[in-house]
């Protein structure tokens, strides 16, 4: 950081500089604005990480890569311009940028991995046709995310009902508070709705077979969930950290119900109601496991 002067929170990197070093401005709390010249071709890993006062940045077209943790936990960053010259955005590049309101992912970027985790002010995201890999937690804890769009010519992903799905529609990769899970989904991926705190209820359609690890974890306002007949497995902590009060199970035989201990790890099931089909009410109400719930409720109509 000693290479460059900061005046009233603003740093203008001189023309001719070609590189911003690894962690060069890391934890610089006086930095509010950075001006990067078009002679810079390389930004080092973690170059601006934890610059909590940094509010805006424009990346010049000379840059082709935003590296790992480049703007990690820049909690005041509201605006960032990423030019179409950028082809790589590294893991956790914008993680924790809680005030970042919008961002454009350039065509050419192929891989996203925890890139925008905990960007709590991000309202919509557009995924270009070039993106072929989206890692777990890439958009987790984006609590205000309401719209998900994927370019129609993307060969791997598509968007339906504000969900990001694989092209064949079988795997739900990630969703948001306004998601409607479409018919045809077989798998809800690990961390698909993780920390989606504005999600209050969700309908899992018939046909879903697998509900992944932490898929609805820490959705603290989620109050109800349904388990369709098709579900074969609900894995570790799938609904931990929620406010679920009611579970709707569409299975006639309680012994065929997927294990609910691990998915609800950390939650007290004796505070939850389980709603079951009318014809199976007796079996559930006398079943040793389901007796542990607050109440077994007879449903005369399908949830």
Write out the residue ranges for each language-model feature.
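A structural signal for leucine-rich repeat
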Residues: 117, 140, 239-240, 261-267, ...
């Amino acid at each position: 950081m000693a290479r460059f002067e900061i005046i009233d929170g603003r740093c203008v990197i001189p023309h001719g500089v070609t590189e911003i070093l690894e962690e060069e401005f890391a934890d610089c709390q006086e930095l509010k604005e950075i001006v990067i010249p078009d002679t810079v071709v390389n930004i080092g890993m973690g170059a601006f990480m934890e610059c909590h006062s940094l509010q805006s940045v424009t990346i010049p077209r000379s840059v082709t890569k935003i590296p790992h943790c480049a703007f990690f936990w820049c909690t005041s960053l509201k605006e960032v311009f990423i030019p179409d010259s950028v082809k790589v955005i590294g893991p956790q590049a914008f993680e924790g940028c809680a005030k970042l309101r919008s961002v454009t992912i350039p065509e050419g970027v192929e891989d996203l991995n925890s890139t925008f985790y905990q960007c709590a002010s991000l309202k919509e995201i557009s995924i270009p046709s070039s993106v072929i890999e989206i890692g777990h937690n890439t958009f987790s804890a984006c609590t205000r995310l309401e719209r998900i769009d994927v370019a129609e010519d993307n060969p791997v992903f598509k968007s339906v009902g504000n969900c990001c799905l694989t092209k064949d529609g079988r795997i739900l990769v990630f969703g948001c508070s306004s998601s409607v899970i479409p018919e045809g989904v077989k798998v809800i991926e690990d961390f698909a709705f993780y920390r989606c705190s504005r999600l209050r209820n969700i309908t899992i359609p018939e046909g879903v077979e697998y509900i992944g690890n932490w898929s609805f974890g820490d959705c603290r306002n989620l109050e109800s969930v349904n388990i369709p007949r098709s579900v074969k497995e609900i894995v570790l902590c799938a609904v931990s950290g929620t406010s679920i009060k009611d579970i709707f199970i569409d299975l006639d035989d309680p012994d065929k119900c997927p294990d609910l201990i691990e998915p609800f790890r950390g939650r007290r099931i004796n505070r939850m109601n389980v709603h079951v089909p009318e014809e199976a009410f007796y079996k559930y109400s006398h079943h040793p496991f389901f007796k542990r719930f607050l109440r077994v409720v007879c449903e005369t109509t399908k949830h």
